[in-house]
Amino acid sequence: MRTLWIVAVWLVGVEGNLYQFGKMIKNKTGKPAMFSYSAYGCYCGWGGQGKPQDPSDRCCFLHDCCYTRVNNCSPKMTLYSYRFENGDIICGDNDPCRKAVCECDREAAICLGENVNTYDEKYRFYSSSYCTEEESEKC
C-alpha cells in the first residue's frame, strides 16, 4: 500500500518539488529516483519511522529532518529554481522558503550520491512493518 501511495504522489507531483528533487537524485546517483528511492529503507519515500537501515536511508532521514525545519514552506510541493553547473547543484532563488527547500533537496541528493555504494536492493520497496526499532537519533 505504501508503494502505491508513493507512486500516486509522484504522479500527481511531477510538476512540483518531488520532480525537481528526483532530477537532483538522478544527477548525483545515476539512479532513477522514483524506482530506486521512493520506498527505500525506512525513510526514503513518504513518511518515515524507526532506525535508518544504511547510510543511504540515513540521507533520507536527514532530508525528512530538514523538511521538518522548513515545514511552513510546504516543502513537498514548493517549486524552486536551481541548475547543474560543473557537477554541482546550485540553488538560485531569492525567496527564503524556496531557497531553503532547494537546499534540503540539494543536501540529500549529494548525500545519496556520496553513499550510492551503500545502496542495497534488499531495502528497495522495504516494508514499513520492519521499521519498528526506536530511532537511533533525533532530528
Swiss-Prot record:
One of its GO terms (biological process) is negative regulation of T cell proliferation. Its cofactor is Ca(2+). Ca(2+) binds at Y43, G45, G47, D64. Keywords: Calcium, Disulfide bond, Hydrolase, Lipid degradation, Lipid metabolism, Metal-binding, Secreted, Signal. Residues 1-16 form the signal peptide. The keyword Disulfide bond applies. The active site is at H63, D105. Disulfide bonds join C42-C131, C44-C60, C59-C111, C65-C139, C66-C104, C73-C97, C91-C102. It is an enzyme of class 3 (hydrolase). Its main location: secreted. It catalyses: a 1,2-diacyl-sn-glycero-3-phosphocholine + H2O = a 1-acyl-sn-glycero-3-phosphocholine + a fatty acid + H(+). CDD domains: PLA2c. GO terms for cellular component: extracellular region. GO terms for molecular function: calcium ion binding; calcium-dependent phospholipase A2 activity; phospholipid binding. Expressed by the venom gland. PANTHER family: PHOSPHOLIPASE A2 FAMILY MEMBER, PHOSPHOLIPASE A2, MEMBRANE ASSOCIATED. PLA2 catalyzes the calcium-dependent hydrolysis of the 2-acyl groups in 3-sn-phosphoglycerides. Belongs to the phospholipase A2 family. Group II subfamily. D49 sub-subfamily. This is Acidic phospholipase A2 4. It comes from Echis carinatus sochureki.
